Structure formats: C-alpha cells, structure tokens
Amino acid sequence: MLKIGDKQFESRLFTGTGKFANSRLMAEAIQVSGSQLATMALKRVDVNDQQDDILLPLVQAGVNLLPNTSGAKNAKDAVFAAQLAREALGTNWLKLEIHPDPKYLMPDPIETLSAAEQLVREGFIVLPYCHADPVLCKRLEEVGCAAVMPLGAPIGSNKGIVSHDFLEIIIDQANVPVVVDAGIGSPSHAARAMEMGADAVLVNTAIAASNDPVAMAKAFKLAVESGRMAYEAGLACKVSHAVASSPLTSFLDEL
C-alpha cells in the first residue's frame, strides 16, 4: 500500500487525462489500468459543469483527482492556478508544474521550489514535477512536499528512464514517495522504474497515443505490478564475470 499525504493507494500507476481521442476512451483506459489517481490541467475542464466529459467519468469511477498547474510559467502563475483548482474542485491535492519553455517543457527548478514553499504553507498537498536532480528533490522534501515527481525523460518523449543514475540517488535518499513522471514510453520503462525502487509512475502519452489505449493501459498495469514485485523480492546482484548456475567441474574431473 502506497501512502501519500492523507491518502492510500493500492495501485502504483498514476495516469494522465490528455491526448486521448475522446473522453469515453480515456475513462475506459483509466478504469482498466486500475489507477486511483489521475491528473488533469485545470484549463482543460469546465469546473462549473457537473457533466464535464473529463471530470464526470473520473468522479463516477472513484478516481482521485490531481489538478496540475500546466501552463504556469512562474511561481505566481502556479499559486494562482492552484488556488483556483482548490476552489473549483474541492481538493488541496496539486501536481505542481512550472515550465516556461513551450518547446522542451523543462521544469523551472527555482520557480518550482519557490511555489512549493508557498503552497505547502497554504495547506496544499504538493507533488512537484521536477528535474531528476537529487539536491532539488531533497530541498522540495524539506519544504514539505508530500512526494517528488522527477522526470524520466522530457514530457511526451517516450524515451524512457534516461535519468537512471540520478533517479537511483533520489530514491535512495528520499523520505517521501518518489513518483517517476514524464518520458515513460513503454511498459518495460515503467517496470524498470519500479525495479529501481520508485514508489509509483505517472503515465499519459504512452497510453493515450498508442493504437489501443485500453490494451496498453492493461499492459502498464501489469508492468508496474511486476516491477514492484521484483523490487520487493530483491533483484540478484550484477557481477562483471560469469557465474555458472550448475557447476559440474568436480564431477567431470572424476571421469
């Protein structure tokens, strides 16, 4: 069981709501994935419409909502968006995203830390999207973030765990859950993150942009479960030389 803030999750696969062909497909894929937490940009939902085609199916399925501040270019924008989200959706959970560069969508570490400090003081449960920077992740933890969400690779790139070495350090030193977010392009990438000891992964593009999002969601569900199981079982140590699994040298010497 994964605990973040005041909630517990059986599923360690978190999902996004963007890039799906339609809301029906989004809802079906998220349901099949088993995900209990889905993020959405406030700008994509009509919070005044109880029948909003993104919000309604998630609420009906009992999926926890994680509004994000996508589109914010600085801390001021992010704090304002967070306050709107809390008022509109009735949740103090927030995925903090600040990426001023629209081409590469790299998170701004300085503005992210500044916004995180203020939002924590205002009572938000903050999950910041950030670079795979061990120092930054530790600082975000120290200011009170409920989890950290370092990137595996740039958003939507599907390149996988390119920040592997830094993620290992972050996971090793963290006292809050580590959710690998962005760049995960295949179920094997998700399994790898879980095998490293990540507490969860967040996947959107790899599911939504696949030829069969529902089947891909199921594949990610199984990958996350198997990766976590492998981590808990304890992976065999890597060695630089061969070690025979069934040595028969003494037997052969007797022939």
Curated annotation (Swiss-Prot):
Q: Which SUPFAM superfamilies match?
A: ThiG-like
Enumerate the GO terms in the molecular function aspect: thiazole synthase activity
The record's EC number reads: 2.8.1.10
Q: List the CDD domains.
A: ThiG
GO CC annotation: cytoplasm
Q: Which residues bind 1-deoxy-D-xylulose 5-phosphate?
A: G156, A182, G183, N204, T205
Please give the subunit comment from the record.
Homotetramer. Forms heterodimers with either ThiH or ThiS.
**Name of this protein:** Thiazole synthase
The species this protein belongs to is: Vibrio campbellii (strain ATCC BAA-1116)
Question: Gene for this protein?
Answer: thiG
